[in-house]
Amino acid sequence: MTVTVKMLVDKLKLKVVYGNEELLAKAITTADISRPGLEMAGYFDYYSPERLQLVGMKEWTYLKTMTANNRYSVFANIFREETPAVIVARGLEIPEEMLQAAKENGVAVLQGRNSTSSLSGDMSWYLNSQLAERTSVHGVLVDIYGMGVLIQGDSGIGKSETALELVKRGHRLVADDRVDVYAKDEGTLWGEPAEILLHLLEIRGVGIIDVMSLYGASAVRDSSQVQLCICLEHFENDEVFDRLGNSNEEIELQGVKIPRIRIPVKTGRNVSVVIEAAAMNYRAKQMGYDATKTFKDRLTDLISKNGED
């Protein structure tokens, strides 16, 4: 996905101090952000001009100790054709020499009101999510108790209907039919809807419904961390399904492994309640409580007592 300077401005509500349409249309190619303190001191080894340049209180205070000519020389060296933009944090005053060098080198100058660390974190979060490589998977993503659950299964098995029931039970729809997944950082998988399908759910016999319009803003999310995969399968008498919770199945998406639970579907079974229970049980395991282990311990104790008798 291409991220432009204007997209960053709109997302973080930054002020454009200098920059025309052409400069704001520049592509940001990396999520890495540079704070050019060493460069201001004249050290340019390993300098990465393709990064966003963030000026905070430390850099700004150091600039104040320089003469006007030195300030201009610093920015003339920092600003390159491939530099997307420079952002000044805390609403600090923009030095005239910075503006002059930016105009001469074609670099947008932006200003943010937040602290430097807050602004840096917001930019990194946004850029990491937007620039990450994406994979589209078939399924429905629902946020259940703050945990993203990817529901998969054959076409027509009832994934969307199950998601609708979960929404009615107070959970939140993230994506239906197509889920775009990406690894935001090592070991963390996120999912979001395709833009054209945002907040929409397709129900056979009814058609497409807008979940946000029908159930309100609290019934949807734009993205969620995917932590569990539920696979709905047609119930077959000769098929063996896990009954004790011993299964350690996993699926791998974008290099991240997440647990996978197979749930049989048959007439009269309330699948949404089962999925809700599976999500809560998984969270309980993450917190250190394992009902399967508790059952095994009780069974072992019972066998030991019977053996003694």
UniProtKB/Swiss-Prot annotation:
The Walker A ATP-binding motif also binds Pi and PPi. Mg(2+) binds at S160, E202. SUPFAM superfamilies: HprK N-terminal domain-like, PEP carboxykinase-like. This is HPr kinase/phosphorylase. Residues 264-269 are annotated as: Important for the catalytic mechanism of dephosphorylation. It catalyses: [HPr protein]-L-serine + ATP = [HPr protein]-O-phospho-L-serine + ADP + H(+); [HPr protein]-O-phospho-L-serine + phosphate + H(+) = [HPr protein]-L-serine + diphosphate. Belongs to the HPrK/P family. HAMAP family: HPr_kinase. Its EC number is 2.7.11.-, 2.7.4.-. InterPro entries: HPr(Ser)_kin/Pase, Hpr_kin/Pase_C, Hpr_kin/Pase_Hpr_N, P-loop_NTPase, Ser_kin/Pase_Hpr-like_N_sf.
